């Protein structure tokens, strides 16, 4: 058996990437962003093809990601930030709702969203993971953008025109 295997494509040339970073826990989010931008550059993404916006906190990431997905032609999106556990249930609410929003946006739009929002117990844990997570998100965004593009059916203008004509004829016959 010889299955067709799509191998990971980490060539970022020509890709358009949108990044949303939460400003809450500023130092951690900025460390993630710096590492992410560096890795995107290493992967060949032109800095002119990257848009970065910031939002107040993790719960606002979803709104910005949703508008970016609907308004611009991004190949992938990246969410960055940190939610650090406190003494109340708020951590669970923010973490769960933020993750749910990110997944929903990706599934509903078909645009990959790399979730780089750290959910940790302490500032030290967040600081230790920030740069690595930012770079990982760049890799995920480029790989998934290329995978989605590879899985898209190729458009054949002549076949589309014929299909449109056939569909129009069927519609006419039904009336």
Curated annotation (Swiss-Prot):
The keyword Transferase is annotated on this UniProt entry: yes
Region (Disordered), start-end ranges: 151-175
Protein name: 6,7-dimethyl-8-ribityllumazine synthase
Pathway assignment: Cofactor biosynthesis; riboflavin biosynthesis; riboflavin from 2-hydroxy-3-oxobutyl phosphate and 5-amino-6-(D-ribitylamino)uracil: step 1/2
Gene: ribH
Comp. bias (Acidic residues): 152-175
Organism: Bordetella petrii (strain ATCC BAA-461 / DSM 12804 / CCUG 43448)
Domain of life: Bacteria
CDD domains given in the database record: Lumazine_synthase-I (cd09209)
Keyword annotations of the record: Riboflavin biosynthesis, Transferase
GO function terms (MF aspect): 6,7-dimethyl-8-ribityllumazine synthase activity
Stored HAMAP family: Lumazine_synth (MF_00178)
Residues reported to bind (2S)-2-hydroxy-3-oxobutyl phosphate: 87-88, 129
């Amino acid at each position: 058996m010889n299955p067709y295997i799509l191998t990971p494509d980490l060539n970022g040339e020509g890709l358009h990437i949108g990044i949303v970073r939460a400003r809450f826990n500023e130092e951690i989010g900025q460390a993630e962003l710096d590492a992410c931008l560096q890795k995107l550059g290493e992967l060949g993404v032109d800095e002119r093809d990257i848009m970065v916006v910031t939002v107040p906190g993790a719960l606002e990431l979803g709104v910005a990601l949703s508008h970016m997905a609907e308004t611009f032609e991004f190949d992938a999106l990246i969410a960055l930030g940190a939610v650090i556990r406190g003494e109340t249930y708020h951590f669970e609410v923010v973490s769960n709702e933020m993750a749910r929003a990110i997944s929903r946006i990706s599934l509903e739009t078909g645009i990959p969203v790399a979730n780089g929002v750290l959910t940790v117990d302490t500032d030290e844990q967040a600081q230790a993971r920030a740069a690595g997570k930012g770079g990982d998100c760049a890799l995920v965004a480029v790989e998934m953008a290329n995978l989605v593009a590879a899985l898209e059916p190729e458009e054949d203008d002549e076949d589309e025109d014929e299909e449109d004509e056939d569909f129009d004829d069927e519609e006419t016959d039904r009336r």
